[in-house]
A protein has these predicted regions:
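Pre-Walker A (Motif I) flank of P-loop NTPase domains
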Residues: 1-6, 93-94
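Walker A/P-loop
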Residues: 17
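Post-Walker A helix-loop "phosphate-sensing" segment adjacent to the P-loop in P-loop NTPases
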Residues: 25-33
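ATP-dependent small-molecule kinase phosphotransfer cores
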Residues: 37-96, 102-106
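A glycine- and Lys/Arg-enriched "phosphate-lid" helix/loop adjacent to the NTP-binding pocket
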Residues: 39, 43, 90-95, 107-162, ...
Length: 258
C-alpha cells in the first residue's frame, strides 16, 4: 500500500499539535515528521520529540547540504522538514503527516501536488488571543506585543485557506479530531481502497463536509472575524477588547500549540 503525504497548517495557537497527537493515538500507520527549528525549546519540549533543535548556523549548513524537503523562516526562526522523514515513511508503507506553515506547505505542494493538504482555523480572534496569552503565561511572561503580532500574522495565514483541500475549524476538540480522522480514512479509502467497514458512509460524509469547496458557508463567520472577508475588500481586523477575566473563561486545552 502506498503511503499518503498529509500536510497540516494553522496559525500559531490554533491547536494543530493537539489534533495531530490525538489522531496518532486513534489511527495506526501515520508517521509524524519531527521538524527542525532554530527557535529555543519551550517548557518541557525535548530534542527529537516536539522538534529537532539546531543553531542558526547548523540549520543553514543543512540547507546548503540539501537536507530539507522544505524550510521557511517564521517569526525570526527557521523551521524545516528533512527529506529523510519522507523516505523512511515510504519504506515502511506508512502515511506521513507534515506539520508545517503556509510557506513550507506551498513548497511541498509545488514538488508533490498529490499531497493532501489540511488547514486548521481557530474559531475567532478572541479564542486565539486567549490561547496565545495562556501559552505566554505558561512560559512565565505575557508579551502583549508578541500576542498582537501573532494575531495579525494569523489573519495573513488564513488568507491562504483556498490553497488547501480540507478546512477544519478547531472550536470543539473532539469534533475536530473526528474530522481529521475521517479525512485520513477517507483518503486511504479513495486512494488505496482501504476498508473502513461499517463506518464507511459516515466517515466519507464527515470528510466531504470538510472539503474546502464545501465549506464556504461554515467558514464565513471565521473569515469575517479575522477580517479576511471585508465588505470593501480590505482586511478588517477585529481582535476585540475583551478583558483578561473574559479570556480566562475561554477553552484553553490547546494553549501550548504552535
Amino acid at each position: 500500500m502506498a503511503g499518503i503525504l498529509f500536510i497540516i497548517s494553522a496559525p500559531s495557537g490554533s491547536g494543530k499539535s493537539t489534533l495531530v497527537s490525538e489522531l496518532r493515538k486513534q489511527v495506526s500507520g501515520v508517521d509524524f515528521s519531527v521538524s527542525w527549528t532554530t527557535r529555543a525549546p519551550r517548557g518541557s519540549e525535548a530534542h527529537g520529540r516536539e522538534y529537532n533543535f539546531a543553531s542558526r548556523e547548523e540549520f543553514e549548513r543543512m540547507i546548503e547540504a540539501g537536507v530539507f524537503l522544505e524550510y521557511a523562516e517564521v517569526f525570526g526562526s527557521y523551521y524545516g522538514t528533512a527529506r529523510q522523514s519522507l523516505l523512511d515513511a515510504r519504506a515502511a508503507g506508512h502515511d506521513l503527516l507534515l506539520d508545517i506553515d503556509v510557506q513550507g506547505a506551498a513548497q511541498v505542494r509545488a514538488r508533490m501536488p498529490e499531497a493532501v493538504s489540511i488547514f486548521v482555523m481557530p474559531p475567532n480572534p478572541r479564542v486565539l488571543r486567549t490561547r496565545l496569552r495562556n501559552r505566554s503565561r505558561a512560559e512565565g511572561v505575557v508579551n502583549e506585543e508578541e500576542v498582537y503580532r501573532r494575531l495579525n500574522e494569523a489573519s495573513k495565514e488564513i488568507e491562504n485557506y483556498r490553497e488547501y483541500g480540507y478546512i477544519l475549524v478547531n472550536d470543539i476538540l473532539d469534533r475536530a479530531v473526528a474530522q481529521l480522522e475521517a479525512i485520513v480514512l477517507a483518503e486511504r479509502f479513495y486512494r488505496n481502497g482501504e476498508s473502513i467497514a461499517y463506518r464507511s458512509r459516515r466517515v466519507l460524509e464527515v470528510a466531504a463536509a470538510c472539503l474546502q469547496s464545501n465549506s464556504r458557508e461554515r467558514l464565513n463567520p471565521v473569515l469575517e472575524a479575522f477580517g479576511v472577508l471585508g465588505s470593501n475588500g480590505q482586511q478588517q481586523l477585529n481582535f476585540g477588547q475583551d478583558s483578561d477575566e473574559e479570556d480566562s473563561n475561554d477553552d484553553s486545552e490547546d494553549d501550548n500549540d504552535d
